[in-house]
Each structure stands twice: as C-alpha cells, then as structure tokens.
Amino acid sequence: MRAIVLNTIKYSDKDLIAELLTEKDGCLSFMQRINTSKRAKIRTAWFQPLTRLDVDYDDRPAHKLKRLATAQPLPLLTIPYEPAKTTMALFLAEFLRVTMRSEPASPLLFEYVWNSIEWLDTCRESFANFHLVFLLHLARFFGFEPNLEAPSPNCYFDLESGTFTTVRPLHPNVLLPEEAQLLPTLMRMNLATMHLFKLSGEQRSQLLRFMNNYYKLHIPNFAELKSLKVLQEVFA
C-alpha cells in the first residue's frame, strides 16, 4: 500500500511518531522505533517529508497509533539534496498535514499528490512556481477550487465564493482589484507552462499569501504554518 511521509515527532529516545498520508485510509499516525542501522528492517532515514513509501500495517480502527509491519521507500533523487526543493517539501508536507488531518481518504487526491512529488523530484530547473500550481489544483479535491478568470478589469475577488465580482461584497473576505490582478496569471499556470511565467519574489509571495488565506477560510481549524515564512524567504 502506498503512503507519503508528512511529519515525524520524536516520542522518546527510542521511538518517533510518523504521520503518513495513506492511499487507503487517509492520514494516519504510526509509532516507529528509531533505528539508524543499515540492516534495520525499517530505517528512520526513510521518514523525511514527502518521501514515498510502500507500506503494510494493521489497519484495525481500535489502534489510534498504528505500527508498520513493513516499509520500502521509493528514494527521492533531488528533493533532499537541493535546499530550494527541501524547503518546498517541508512546506507542502506541513500544508497537507494541516488540510488532510480530518479528511476522509481520497484515492484521486492521493494520486495527485504522489504524481506531483514525482514531478518536483525529477524537475531540473524552473520549479519556483510549483507550490503555487500545486495548491491551486489541490483545492479541486476539497471542492472549492477558485475560479480565477476575471470577467473584466478592476474586479474584486470574493474569497468566500472563490470568484471575481464587479460589485464589492459586503463581507470583509475580499481582495481589492489591485490585489487581485495577479490571480488570472495563476489560473493560466500548470506544470507544463509555469516556467513561462516570470514572477518577481514579491508577486510570488503575494500569490502564496492568497492561497494560504483562501485555504484558511475554507478549511476548519486551519493552523498557522511554521514553514510558510521560510518558503517565502527562499523564493523571494
């Protein structure tokens, strides 16, 4: 069964808790023995953010903290070794952990995340906009993908409905026309074309703040992301 590492927390000198996004059961927490030996059946080094695993575990619901029976990694080629990709992986893993914590399993969402990691890991250049494209299309699986096509210039963007409007909404969750003018650019991006869009560091930060605030409005109990500021600084 496929799984993706989202987070690890040291539980004791001998154990850690690993949070995995699993294909079958969504987000699960596992108690795992800390073992750095190369002969270990399951190595601690495999539990880096966005590492993809093939795992087997006892899925009985009575066990809140589960145990892995077996695990085999699909080694990452570049993400752990390129600082920009590592920073992006830390952010996306934290983002997925926050958004997926109470969500039911979704094979389509899992496939999207799995394939996106593959793309980032094998991409050699021009990936600075990857996290923006990833977050935009991830929203589709939650049912609130924004419509970023502006009907005319000088429109407001309603964060609650996820659409542009020529009339300013009465609620405060709105982007003014000058704040929303970059959104149609984001809508035109995908993994194949995003390298064609040359954004400044400030523009990229602005779009990231938009996506973060948009999710915060639509996901209950959306926590503050510790890695957000670091990501903004790296891609400024």
Features from the language model and the residues they span:
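Non-catalytic alpha-helical scaffolds and adjoining flexible linkers that form interface surfaces
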Residues: M1-A236
